[in-house]
Amino acid sequence: MEDGCSHGAVRLEEERDENQSSSNIDFQPSKLGTKEYWDHAYERELEVFRESGDTSEVWFGEESMDRILNWLEKHDIPKDSAMLDIGTGNGVLLVQLAKAGFTNLSGIDNSSTAVELAKAVAEKEGIFSLKLQVADFLNPMPYLSHYEICIDKGTFDAISLSFDNPAEKLRHYHQSLLNVLKNGGLFLITSCNWTKQELVNHFNEGLELLEELLTPKFHFGGKTGSSVTVLVFKRKA
């Protein structure tokens, strides 16, 4: 599960009350918030990969991966840092991280087909060091712990579009993140559904905003909008 954008429209930063609790933010439920949708999507993608060796488009575009990689390089993040890709999907982000020299990379997805695809993609690229597991981040296994960096590129968005009690699932996500991220660890999140302030409000317990990464902004009608928000949080000690 990677990208849960509810729409492709530009999101106005002034659209919602910046002090509104995430539990009160009501997105229209979507098939993008269901496991069945992603199982079917990755079944199709795996079939295409087996036939042609090609993966589908990178969610949020390749610039989303470049943005993360550039930030990690800029801040001299140690290459052996334990990293977890939450909802790894086809595993392309982990492959790019491995190519950049990072050596302690893990990825989870609740779709077994996604994990199968990610393993196939990594193998094709000659990368055999990735630790890939089928796991539901909302109900993490005991081995999911003590990561120095966690990355989310669309999974939090998808969960917010669930038909079944999304507010509770988002709270579980937050708690799971606090459980697996080391004190002082970093959380990088890319979202197309949530504004900066909404994400800060949601993750304010146990996490502090470290930086907002630059993304394209749009100005119209006297307002500012964006299609994606990328934030870096730090786990409080």
PLM regions: where:
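Class I S-adenosyl-L-methionine
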Residues: K196-A237
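A short SAM/SAH-binding and catalytic strip from SAM-dependent methyltransferases
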Residues: E148-A167
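N-terminal auxiliary segments of SAM/dcSAM-dependent transferases
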Residues: M1-H40
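Conserved alpha-helix/loop element of class I SAM-dependent methyltransferases that forms part
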Residues: V58-S81
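Conserved beta-strand signature within the Rossmann-like core of class I S-adenosyl-L-methionine
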Residues: G184-S191
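A short acidic, Gly/Pro-enriched loop at the edge of an enzyme's catalytic core
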Residues: L138-C150
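A short glycine-rich, Lys/Arg-flanked "PGG" loop and its adjoining helix->strand segment in the class I
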Residues: P166-N183
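Class I SAM-dependent methyltransferase SAM/SAH-binding core
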Residues: A82-L84, G89-P140
